[in-house]
Every structure is written in structure tokens, then in C-alpha cells.
């Protein structure tokens, strides 16, 4: 999660259009979907033309013999590392990519590097249309890039070293905040030696030291559905030491259906809903259990106990 300064452009008002019934467009049954596929392909072709002239895909020339094709954070790293020692094609629209602009740009340089983290999406496209570029043969597929890494790969020059302290900086991995009520919960779960099926949120940190009590985290809501599957597969004895842990906002988002499945399939799982009345990890926004809308207007508050009882949870 991050934050940054942004520049606002002039707000454009878009007038509401009249509503028209058009099930051929909006009801995606197979017969309609086949016809709409033609529209999708036409739209992509139109986007290809737009990408060729869009200011989001721009060329920055410095009179260099080295060309750099990059977008996003990789572009910023390249600019920091290489400065005016390279020319740049800054990609702002990554799909569809501007084939003509890329070919025209690449034709001017002795070497063209594609700098992108992880999978070689732009690089593979360039090679597929006959553009000779240098990419993952000098850059790694894994992890995050740095300006010094890029400078070494492109110019074979080490970046200047900064003054460092003699003693290494103490390692401080992320942990639950001081005073967080989840700390006590995971401390107890660890002491009891339970198998904990975790979920997405601050409490995912229950997997890290010193608590180290969460055994699995897959996706939102999976703490309940995965534990339900474990109990069915491994039996009653295993289920006695198994517990699901999910936050209030994640439960509202995608945990309810898993709990319904437990009731429907006659399961007997233990589920802990960590109700801290906030969406703690991703913005501190309200959710249906807080009694306020996203605009901080008072609204009906979902009662978790009543909700669980309404789908058949008895204890």
C-alpha cells in the first residue's frame, strides 16, 4: 500500500443518458455473447489506433544511442539510473501496446532495452512483432528492480555508493500494531497449538514471528471454506484442533457464503470473527457492521450474531 502526490486535471462533467432497454447488449447468454464478441474485437482494434497517438505513450529523446521501453515504476527507476544517457518510450497503455510506435522508436537505436519487473509482457510483444530488444537475458524475472541494477545492466557501470553505518540496521519485519486486539487472540491460538486457517487482513501477520499461529492464507473468505474442506477430508479428530479466523469486513465481503456451506453440508467447524469494527488493513473505511456508510452517514448496522443465527448457526 502506498500514497503519492498526483496532479489533477480539469473535471469533466458527464451528463446522464436516457436509459434504454437493450438485452442483446447486456444479457450475456451464449447467443448474445457470440455477437458481442465481434464488438469486443472491434473495440480492441480501435484502442490499438488510440494507443499509437495517446500522450500516455510518449517518447523522450536525449540524443542517445540507447533506447529504453518501460512503464510504471520500472520507467521511474530507469530515469533515475540512466538520466539523459538513454532515450525513452514511456508506456502508459500496456494493452493494447502501440506496435507502430514501438517499431518506429526501436529503429533509431543501436540497443533497445525493455525494462519491466516480473513476466516479460512488453518484451514478448516486441519480439512477436519483429522488434529486437534486450530484456530478461540481462534482467531477472524475480523480485523488484532498483536503479543500481538497471544502471549495471544497461551501462555496465556501478551506481555510486552511499555512506553506510558500520553496524547493520536491525531487522524489523511487519508485526501487528501495539495495542491491537488480534495479538491476544493469536497468542491464545498459538498456546493451544491449534491448526489455524487464516484470511486476508492485518491478522495475516499472525503467521509471522513471534505469534506464528496461522497455517494457511489463500484468499478472501477461504479461511472458512478451506477449513470446511479440511474437516470433511481429515475427520472429526482433526477438526477438534482446527479453527478459522476472519475479520469482520472480510467476513462481510466473502465469508458468509463459506459459513452457509458449513451449515448446508452439516459441518461442525469453529469460526472466529475478529470484529474490530473497521477495515483495518486497506484504508480504515467503514463496512456493513459499523453502522456508517463510506460517506460517514449513519445507516443500519449489520449484527454479526443475528446474521450468523439467521443462516442456521446455533452456537
Label each PLM-derived region with a short phrase.
Residues 2-8, 76-79, 122-124, 185-188, ...:
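Short helix/loop capping segments that flank catalytic or ligand/cofactor-binding pockets
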Residues 95-96, 120-122, 139-143, 203-205, ...:
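Short gly/pro/ser/thr-enriched loop/turn and capping motifs at secondary-structure boundaries
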Residues 193-209:
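Acidic-glycine-rich active-site phosphate/pyrophosphate-binding loop
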Residues 72, 198-202, 273-276:
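Short, small-residue-rich loop/turn micro-motifs
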Residues 207-315:
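Thiamine diphosphate
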Residues 1-176, 181-185, 191-194, 198:
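Flexible, low-complexity linker and terminal segments
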